[in-house]
Amino acid sequence: NVFRFFPGDVVVKAAHARYAVEELGVKRPAVIFQTTAYGQSGRAELDRNLTALGRPAVFAEGLDVSVKDMLPVLSKVRESGADALLLHLHSGPTALVVRQARAMGLDIPIIAGSAMHQPETAALLAPSELAGVCAESGASPISESDPATRAFADAYRTAFDREPDAFALGQYDGVQKI
């Protein structure tokens, strides 16, 4: 048997796209994704959902995980006339895109993937770089008010001396179910 305790791209990318279009009013989204299997899956779901919402991406490009200079792709985002940038990248590239976008004055909302919600990713950025940035996440144990989730978060901090992320909560839930 296979157990999965973290929602897949079919779920989170639907929410990612809906938030951009329905909550932020995005009309011309750009998408930057990783060229890994992870990135391809997320990109496919973002494409499907943005198109279904009547807001297909005006620009989309994949990046290898090793890319450090994001200015070429960010320049293409700017040239496309995008009014928001949706990311489906790993942690390091997410931080690089956000930092370099802000440094070049690309002042559009950035709706990142779950990597941005990881405390380690946010710690790579200055608070000023995070202005106008949000992220989708399957869960947010550091934001929950539910007593059981708060107890998990407190125990996690005590055991690991760091903030729990959605992946930690998913693993915890998985072990509890077994």
What do the predicted segments below correspond to?
Residues 1-105, 141-151:
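Extracellular/periplasmic Venus flytrap/periplasmic-binding protein
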Residues 98-172:
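Extracellular/periplasmic periplasmic-binding protein-like sensory domains
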Residues 175-178:
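Non-catalytic, well-ordered alpha-helical segments in soluble enzyme domains
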